[in-house]
A protein has these predicted regions:
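Short helix-loop boundary/capping segments
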Residues: 126-128, 132-234
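Extracellular carbohydrate-recognition regions
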Residues: 1-72
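Well-ordered, non-membrane alpha-helical segments in soluble/globular domains
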Residues: 106-113, 154, 233-239
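Solvent-exposed loop and beta-edge segments used for protein-protein assembly and interaction
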Residues: 8, 119-129, 148-152, 252-257
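Short N-terminal edge-element motif at the start of the domain
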Residues: 69-141
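Low-complexity, polar-biased intrinsically disordered regions enriched in Pro/Ser/Thr/Gly
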Residues: 95-101, 140-148, 241-250
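Disulfide-rich extracellular domains of secreted proteins
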Residues: 1-3, 7-22, 48-49, 57, ...
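Long, compositionally biased interface segments
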Residues: 208-288
Length: 288
């Protein structure tokens, strides 16, 4: 069997294109990179944020790194054998020290990549997701009473999409989630429901304990390694979507391919959070 890395530039050595928070198609994306970088393969998304990192100056960060800061966020990259990306968000600044209402949009800070050649599920024997993360202990404004809709989630999503051109369901997709942290819980809970943030697509996220089987709670402040064949869970996600009435024009697994990935923070309340990421990988183990 052949193993193929699906991600381009998994160490982020070539930086990012950065889209503005609320009008990603209104102007060309900004360039966030460092000396000797080439054309970026990644997008940096900052949906619904109140500050735009596109306008911040690049600063040196330690002996081998660079950083970009706004009042509400910080992006930091450090070179090395295993380059490290850090994403910081200050929800107290993002929400002006107030509590977000449950129907209001929430701030994101994500990295995103469209795969150059989507890989069909039917061609896979395994799909191996791997990374190392270090999520710092979070803090909140102690004067504010957080509700259940106020949280910070550090997670990845992979789109499982119908890529059969000419098919009635072409382009329809499933969000498949890989949760690391949900600050409401010791470990993130399973989630299977339609997206309320705009896409309207089905989200299938197994629980944190499905991934981190040795932990009772997520170990904040420590490097945690994840290596997992996620293909069986993707199949379970498609089945759940069909049962829930989604993807009804695409009721055939052979239509679907791995299409894109994003990873980062979704911040729905006034929490201050930070996480580091290194050794990211998405490997297709192809059938013989």
């Amino acid at each position: 069997m052949t193993t193929k890395e699906l991600l381009r530039d998994p160490g982020f050595r070539n930086g990012f294109y950065v889209t503005p928070p609320n009008n990603p198609h209104g102007m060309p994306p900004a360039l966030m990179c460092w000396p000797e970088a080439s054309t970026p393969d990644w997008m940096l998304r900052q949906w619904n944020s109140t500050s735009d990192v596109s306008w911040s100056w690049m600063q040196e960060y330690g002996p081998n790194g660079f950083r970009w800061d706004t009042e509400g966020k910080s992006i930091r990259w450090t070179a090395g054998q295993s380059p490290t990306l850090e994403l910081h968000m200050d929800g107290i600044a993002e929400y002006g020290g107030k509590l977000r209402t449950p129907d209001a949009p929430w701030a994101h800070l994500l990295i995103e990549q469209e795969l150059a050649q989507p890989t069909l599920l039917s061609a896979l024997n395994e799909l191996r997701f791997g990374c190392e993360t270090n999520v710092k202990p979070f803090r909140s404004n102690g004067d504010l009473r957080l509700e259940n809709w106020h949280t910070a989630q550090w997670q990845a999503f992979i789109t499982i999409q119908n890529r059969e051109k000419g098919h009635p369901g072409y382009g329809d997709f499933l969000w498949f989630g890989i949760p690391f942290v949900d600050t409401r819980y010791a470990m993130p809970k399973r989630h299977a429901a339609g997206d309320t943030a705009g896409s309207g697509k089905f989200i299938y996220t197994p629980s944190g304990r499905d991934y981190f089987t040795i932990f009772d709670s997520y170990p904040y402040g420590e490097w945690v390694s994840l290596q997992r064949d996620i293909l069986p869970m993707i199949d379970a996600g498609l089945t759940a979507a069909w049962k829930a009435g989604f993807l009804q024009k695409s009721r055939d697994r052979r239509l679907f391919a791995i299409s894109s990935i994003n990873l980062g923070w979704e911040l729905t309340g006034p929490l201050v959070v930070a996480a580091s990421l290194r050794n990211l990988s998405l490997q297709a183990v192809l059938r013989a």
